[in-house]
UniProtKB/Swiss-Prot annotation:
PANTHER family: BCAS2 PROTEIN (PTHR13296), PRE-MRNA-SPLICING FACTOR SPF27 (PTHR13296:SF0). Keywords: Coiled coil, mRNA processing, mRNA splicing, Nucleus, Spliceosome. One of its GO terms (biological process) is RNA splicing. The gene is spf27. The keyword Transferase does not apply. This is Pre-mRNA-splicing factor spf27. Transmembrane segments: none annotated. It is found in: Nucleus. The keyword Lyase does not apply.
Amino acid sequence: MNIIIEGAENIDSLPYVDDSVNENEQELINKLISDEMSTFTPPDYLAQLPSFIDIDYNNFQFLENDFKRMEKEEKMKEFDIGRYKVEPTTTMIKQQLNEKQWNDSLNNARSQLEHQDIRKINLELLQRYGGNSWKLYLSDLEILQKTLKKQLDQKKQQIEEINIQRKLSQEQTFEKIQQHDKKFLELVYKNTEIESACKSIELEIEQLKLKQQLQQQQENGDLNNK
């Protein structure tokens, strides 16, 4: 199961040729991002987890008792370690124990002896095989660490190659954009020149029309005088 953590993605695909934005542009960008994110449905990161199980705490009275104890700020009752103790014989004689108490004490002593024997066996096994077990465990960890490091290096190499390709692609595209921008400015300049020339021609035409009208009026006036 993959655990999805919000904001855990490491995105390093930054632009290589774009100019840095100013404060006003940054504010506008942040506002546009916030407006767009407000339309998104919040992701449910717990959808892949098992459904919630409602536990009936009435079946766990010991928890309720502990909660009450904690509310009262009472300390937990100490464990009874009496059965782990072996009373000295002199003390038992002074206490004038009956036969049952003597048998219980004897059984307890046997239990303690058996427990110590088991601990001794465990220590012997640990001394004999524990070192090799830890060596094997550490060897497995080293192999796992090397494998993960190799995978990490491969991923880093892939990311580096992709970023290099992106940089080259952006630089080539940027050159084309600059060429198109230059051509666009040249065309705009030419259009401006053409527009200016057209206006000059239109003005000249208007002047010629006006001159022609004046000449016609003058000719008509001369005819009327005759």
